[in-house]
């Protein structure tokens, strides 16, 4: 008998050998290696804010204070060594600069002021805080 006839008979009785199915292989795209470095970020670090203390003696030095304010650094300005009229001019100038840069200026005591940029938040009344710390009532 021919092999075809035997295959048909075996298939009819269900005893045929299973044919191996050929898997069709689609064209695969090559895998491109990706150099990925892990990004490790310490969530407990906060940027350290430095507060400058400047003691101008002349009105011409007010530009240095404004430059620090433009660089987003808070500045404590001590005007005690200045003439009262010049000190008033400095305060007026710094008030305008703080306003223009969306910052603020607060009087700490006497002739001492805090000039802060917009990224620096001042809460509460500083004069009350200083007075309560040193019992200056």
Swiss-Prot record:
GO annotation (BP), single: FtsZ-dependent cytokinesis
Functional summary from the UniProt entry: Cell division protein that is part of the divisome complex and is recruited early to the Z-ring. Probably stimulates Z-ring formation, perhaps through the cross-linking of FtsZ protofilaments. Its function overlaps with FtsA.
Coiled coil: none
Main location as per UniProt: cytoplasm
Subunit structure: Homodimer. Interacts with FtsZ.
Name under which the protein is recorded: Cell division protein SepF
Subcellular location: Cytoplasm
Alphabetical UniProt keywords: Cell cycle, Cell division, Cytoplasm, Septation
Protein family membership: Belongs to the SepF family.
Annotated organism of origin: Thermoanaerobacter pseudethanolicus (strain ATCC 33223 / 39E) (Clostridium thermohydrosulfuricum)
Entry GO CC: cytoplasm
């Amino acid at each position: 008998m021919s092999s075809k006839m035997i295959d048909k008979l075996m298939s009819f009785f269900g005893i045929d050998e299973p044919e191996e199915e050929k898997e069709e292989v689609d064209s695969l795209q090559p895998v491109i290696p990706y150099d990925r470095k892990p990004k490790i970020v310490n969530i407990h670090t906060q940027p350290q804010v430095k507060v400058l203390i400047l003691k101008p003696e002349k009105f011409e030095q007010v530009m240095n204070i404004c430059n620090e304010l433009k660089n987003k650094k808070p500045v404590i300005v001590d005007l005690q060594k200045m003439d009262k009229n010049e000190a008033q001019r400095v305060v007026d100038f710094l008030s305008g600069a703080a306003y223009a840069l969306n910052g603020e200026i607060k009087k700490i005591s006497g002739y001492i002021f805090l000039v802060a940029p917009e990224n620096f938040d001042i809460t509460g009344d500083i004069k009350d805080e200083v007075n309560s710390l040193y019992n200056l009532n």
